[in-house]
Amino acid sequence: MKIVSVVGARPQFVKLAPIAVAAAAAGVEHVIVHTGQHYDPMLSDVFFDDLGIPAPDVHLGVGSGSHGVQTGAILGALDAIFEEHAPDWVLAYGDTNSTLAAAVSAVKLHYPLAHLEAGLRSFNRRMPEEHNRVLTDHAADLCLAPTEVAMGHLAHEGLADSSVMVGDVMTDVLFQTRDSLAGAPSVLVDELGLTPGEFHVATIHRPDNTDDPARLAEIAAALGSLERPVILLAHPRVVAKAAAHGIDLTQGSLVAHAPLAYPDLIAAVLASRSAITDSGGLQKEAFLLRVPCTTIRPETEWVETVELGWNVLANTPEEIVAAVSRPTPQATDAAPYGDGHAADRVIAELIRHRR
């Protein structure tokens, strides 16, 4: 059996890591296509080595652009790749423009399409990710859902017969990374002289929070007003936006820092008092590590983190400060995202449903 995985952004490569391992263990031929949707200096050889990801077989080098330009460029390039490899499955990951392009190319050329992380819904149609994930689910021959909530969304949309719950592959990666750290010191703590448990780790990147200068300024001011240091792992795009509008990302308690490699990020979150983010991935990672999280959004796809008390949605400066300052949540043994073996189930389901 042959699978072609299409990925283009760092979170997708993290999800790819356990899939690559499981495919190799099952003797499945696995072709990795890197669209180059996001230029990310963290996607270095070290990143691939740390997570055990094989080097991509194909680099498209699409780069940045508007949603239409980027999606169209990826779509145009994928047609020839799929025809060359004639896969038994095209595997699309998550909710990026690379995801949507892979879906459209696969179905137009009549190659079976599987969607990993299917069924997630924010119900916010302003988010480009929401369009991408909904369209990909409805194009897919097999929807690989991470949670029971996601399965419910798929059933509600008439996709129950083509859906299966496998768990969350991010859980696989996180548990492996956590265990490999085994009490090792955090690079961030050592570099900045931080006291473990007495600082917050933050990431802010969504357009709703960064494209409007007034919105970005009020978030920065709120984080800067907190009692403990807030280390903002700022993407170059956010740094450029802030600089263009005279917004200081190092003010009060707020300290801007470059993004971290995945193992270093997990070590930093483990050492922190809490996480503050608008990222879907970090909300879930914080929950799995049992680190409190504040999400600067009015909604989340990962509703289990909120229902179990480890994540609070906060959209105004006042809500952000109150949420970050809240007491530690009640302990829970709940495991809504699986047991760390989702990738094995993904490969097993692809083999089982092979046409």
Protein language model annotation of sequence segments:
Residues 287-331:
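Nucleotide-sugar donor-binding patch of glycosyltransferase catalytic domains
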Residues 60-61, 145, 165, 256-258, ...:
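Short acidic-hydrophobic, aromatic-tinged amphipathic segments that line or gate anion-handling sites
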Residues 81-88, 194-195, 271, 353:
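Glycine-rich phosphate-binding loop signature in dinucleotide/nucleotide-binding domains
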Residues 48, 149, 312-355:
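Leloir-type glycosyltransferase catalytic cores
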Residues 38-42, 61, 139-211:
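A nucleotide-sugar donor-handling region in carbohydrate enzymes
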Residues 4-7, 13-24, 47, 59-158:
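Active-site and donor-binding regions of nucleotide-sugar-utilizing enzymes
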Residues 92-93, 143, 267-305:
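A donor-sugar binding/catalytic signature common to diverse glycosyltransferases
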Residues 37, 45, 65, 182-271:
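Donor-nucleotide binding loops and adjacent catalytic segments primarily
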